[in-house]
């Protein structure tokens, strides 16, 4: 079992690296949890980051969603895609202005933008300005949406993508399963 999980983890890391090389944007955010006292008042803040196991599961869920979208594209039926358009240029310029004031660089050239965004995320990880920059970066992105017209998924760097892996909590996944 250990060998199998170790192998799966190596595969997941390879898939993740390939996604990043293809232009995927990786938000490794902290998850914030509050510990409560006996009166349900917060007495401690705990910051959690994704562990290797979380990333392993994430990569295979993304892969499953991608493969289902690729398979269904070959059919003639209408299909629900999860799409994510290019980021808003004006919002990216605003982000560039803010990060420059904080001492960082953001290259808005389309050929280097994704690498530059990921580099910025890496450089600010764990620093005081991380949450601000993460939030501004997310706001500069287009909103992902469900549609029958595929335009790809910018943030994941996928040509075709859908939601398939969580039919218990997302209705679009149920539609895809049908």
Give the positions of each predicted feature.
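Electropositive polyanion-binding surfaces
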Residues: 1-178
